[in-house]
Structure formats: C-alpha cells, structure tokens
C-alpha cells in the first residue's frame, strides 16, 4: 500500500501576489550564451539581425519576463562604451572573469532588440568592480535620458532616438567574492553602492536597485556582509541579491533532493537579517529579495577548468555547458516551490542561465537546431501556471532520512490561485526515491472547481538526460488525480514533479 500524505489548500491562506519576475533568467557574455547561443548570423534559423529564431521561440515558451544582463562576473571588467556604436569599430577585449576574448559584436542595442523579440525586460548590471559612480551615471544617462546631453545624444547618434527606460539596475555582482574583479570589503562596497544609487536616482528617480548580498551562504562574511551593506544602502535600494547553486558531487541523490531545504533556510536567514537592519534604522520599508542566480551547477566543472587554464582567450568557448539529468529537474522544481512560497519577499529571481550556459535551452554546436534540457519543463510549468496569488498549503507528509539533511518530508508542494482565470495549480514533488505517495488534498474552499489535468515529469532513471534530437525526459498528462466532495486524491509516483490544475466547472 502506498504511503499517504495530506494537504489543505484554502484561498484564505494567502502568502502574496506573485511578482511575475520570479520567473526571470540571466544571460552573461560567457561561453556560448551570446555568440552561438542567442546570436548566430548565417545560421539557417537566424533572422536578419542574426538572432536565432528557434531560441527566441523557446524563450517565449518559457515566458521569461525579465533577463539579467550582461553579467555575472563578466560585468566587473565590462566597459559599456565598447558595446555601443558601429559594430566594426568596437574593440576586442580580454575578458578576465572567464579568460575569454570578448568581441563586442552584441552590445546594449543588440541585446535590447533581442529582449524585445523574446518579450522580456532587461535587468541591467553595472560595473562596480573596476569602475564606479561616474561610469554608472554615464551608462544610465545613455540608456534612459531623453536627449540633449553628451551620452543621451550619443545614443541618438547610434540610431536609438527613444530612451530604453531600463527600470531595474544591479549595483555590481558578487562583490564579496575574492574571485570578483575589483572585489571589495563589505564597507567599501556598501559605501560605493550607496553613493552610486544616490547619484543615479538624481538622473532617473523611477529606477530601482538591487544591491549585492553574499555570493552564497557558505561565504565567511555571510550575514555580516548583508548587515554592513544594508546599513549603508537600506534607504536607497529596493532589493538584496541572493545567489545559490547546488550539485551532486557525492552522487547521493537522496540527499541532493534535500538541498531545496537549504535554499529555504537561506531565504529565512536573509529575511531575518534584512528585518534586523530595518529595525536598527527604525524604517517602515521592507527590503525585498532578488534571487538573481539559482540553479544546479557542477557537471561541467572539470571541463571548465581545463578550458580556462589550458586554452584561454578564445571567443565563445564551450564553458559551463552542464547537461542536466532527471534528478536535476526535480531539484529545480523543488527550488521553484521554495521561491513561490517566499513570494511575499522574493520579487525577482533569475534562473542562471538561459542559453547553453547552465541553461534550460541548448543549441547544437555543430550548426544544428536547439533542444530542451530536462530542467526546461519545471521552469516552464511554473512560469506558465504560477501566476496569481501564492497559497500556503498545510501539509502532513511522511518523511525519510538523508545523509546530510536529517529527516525530510517526502512531499513538497505549493499552490497558486489565479482568480482572474479561475484556476488553481498545485505544484508538488515526491522526493521519495523508492515509494509512491497518495496525496489527499482538501480544496473545499474552491467550490465548483474540477480537475483539468495532472501533468507529470518522471523517469525510472534519475541520471537520464536529453540531447539534440533525443528527448528522453518530457512531461505527460495522466489520470492520477480524482476529485470527490472537495477532496483531491492524487497519486504522486516516486521521484516525480507534478502539476495538478483545477479550473472552474463552467470552463
């Protein structure tokens, strides 16, 4: 007999309206993300601007509302002036973060054109590593000021009359990391970010800022960094950045799927730190979170080290090309559940990255088409069906033991209510690798609703991957959920991602 779990989903248990930007992503000038990724002139599937139409279509399928650009570590040695103006006059640069050669063929204008085609906004990251206040202000003037000044007129001269109106700006990237070009102490960075934000707001009061938090929760200055940086910047910024990546280097799948609990704890700790600074400053303002780098990342580490150490200074080398397996898709689904459950404070999130570089979308390096990695599907489902109000489910689940995270629940879930569309979606993962779970869900508050579909992503092989022309992992629609007198009975197969959708009976 299958194990049993119980859950209550009630429209009164509201967490927050979900900001659609939590389904954002990230494109860095790194590896084949830009060149041979979004941009490949001469390819039979590219448009007149050189952008891959098949890639744009897949990004639209994911429905990515915002894309962080141009980095990442890349941005801390980025000279934005190199990326504008006539392409033939743009210089090649040594790209120090990834020991590559940047040709600047795709720059601000080109990327904005691509983002428009993909129905995405651009979240601009500025260089506070090797540069500072003056250059950040010049870049903002170039992008957002209407005209009549040096840099806004330069934009017009370059063929863009109307300002771009970029709204969301990152004040550097991972400035606590010793690997960062221009790495700073917490107070050095806090003061620089504070003064940069103040100056930029004088140019465009409508913009909002993301300030760098810790690069991950294992950094030696974790939490102390947030305290010091926010003590300087709290009154001037809108979001604190979080980053995390997980891997399964020990090949312990059971413990690997517990790492979403670590992400949940990370967010709780950051919220507590933000609220401590809020109290210290006697502020009435909440600090929101931008989880602008998150994913699984470890498969490509050895190959990446070989390229950067033994074959440096290439244009678009195949860096960070993780090929994701099925268990990676399960963890990505679990991480999405965590983000939705924290939608009261997490307002922006970026799956890192989008194309070819630790990405849901890959392009064939031999000139072929594009394909979907296993992680494409949980992200697509969450982005497509996770719009509305996040509901906090009350879950009673059986548990199992892990090697590094103690006893964890078999079932992790969250629900989203889209009142406008009259839809309820439950996202659930059975992370028990051996046993199916019957999930009984009380949905009596949604009177007149019926089961529309139960989508499942599952595989008997946790290590199976997709490849160009070979889609081994893809979702299917099942009959595994029934409804009777306001209670759902759902069979959650072992190691499965589940999307259970309810709609109003008149639809």
Predicted regions and their residues:
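Non-catalytic accessory regions flanking glycosidase/transglycosidase catalytic cores in CAZymes
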Residues: 1-223, 231-239, 263-264, 268-308, ...
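Active-site His/acidic residue clusters
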Residues: 243-259
């Amino acid at each position: 007999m299958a194990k049993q779990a119980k859950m209550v989903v009630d429209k009164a248990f509201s967490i927050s309206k979900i900001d659609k930007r939590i389904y954002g992503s990230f494109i860095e000038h790194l590896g084949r993300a830009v060149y041979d990724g979004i941009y490949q002139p001469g390819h039979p599937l590219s448009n007149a601007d050189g952008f891959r139409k098949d890639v744009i279509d897949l990004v639209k399928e994911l429905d990515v509302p915002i894309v962080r650009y141009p980095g990442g570590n890349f941005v801390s040695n980025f000279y934005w002036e190199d990326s504008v103006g006539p392409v033939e006059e743009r210089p090649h640069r040594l790209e120090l973060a990834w020991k590559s050669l940047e040709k600047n063929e795709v720059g601000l204008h080109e990327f904005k054109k691509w983002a428009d085609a993909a129905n995405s906004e651009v979240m601009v990251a500025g260089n506070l590593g090797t540069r500072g206040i003056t250059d950040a202000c010049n870049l903002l003037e170039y992008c957002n000021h209407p005209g009549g000044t040096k840099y806004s007129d330069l934009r017009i001269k370059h063929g863009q009359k109307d300002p771009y109106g970029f709204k969301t700006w990152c004040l550097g990237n991972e400035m606590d990391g010793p690997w960062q070009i221009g790495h700073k102490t917490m107070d050095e960075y806090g003061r620089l970010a504070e003064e940069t934000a103040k100056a930029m707001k004088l140019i465009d009061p409508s913009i909002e800022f993301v300030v760098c938090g810790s690069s991950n929760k294992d950094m030696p200055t974790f939490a102390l960094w947030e305290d010091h940086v926010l003590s300087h910047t709290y009154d001037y910024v809108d979001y604190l950045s979080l980053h995390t990546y997980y891997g399964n280097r020990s090949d312990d799948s059971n413990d690997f799927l517990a790492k979403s609990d670590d992400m949940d704890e990370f967010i709780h700790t950051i919220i507590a730190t933000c609220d401590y600074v809020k109290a210290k400053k006697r502020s009435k303002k909440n600090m929101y979170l931008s989880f602008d780098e998150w994913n699984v990342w470890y498969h490509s580490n050895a190959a990446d080290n070989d390229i950067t150490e033994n074959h440096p200074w290439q244009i678009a080398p195949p860096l960070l090309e993780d090929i994701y397996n099925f268990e990676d898709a399960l963890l990505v689904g679990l991480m999405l559940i965590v983000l939705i459950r924290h939608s009261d404070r997490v307002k922006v999130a970026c799956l890192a990255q989008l194309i070819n570089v630790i990405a849901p979308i890959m392009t064939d390096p031999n000139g072929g088409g594009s394909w979907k990695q296993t992680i494409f599907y949980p992200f697509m489902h969450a982005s497509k069906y996770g719009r509305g109000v996040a509901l906090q489910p009350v879950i009673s689940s059986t548990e199992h033991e892990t090697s590094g995270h103690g006893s964890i629940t078999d079932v992790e879930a969250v629900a989203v209510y889209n009142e406008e569309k009259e839809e309820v979606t439950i996202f659930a993962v059975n992370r028990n690798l051996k046993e199916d779970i019957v999930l009984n869900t009380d949905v009596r508050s949604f009177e007149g609703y019926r089961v529309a579909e139960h989508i499942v992503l599952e595989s008997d092989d946790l290590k199976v991957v997709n490849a160009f022309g070979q889609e081994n992992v893809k979702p299917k629609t099942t009959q595994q959920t029934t409804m009777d007198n306001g209670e759902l009975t759902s069979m959650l197969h072992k190691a499965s991602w589940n999307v259970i959708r309810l709609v109003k009976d008149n639809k």
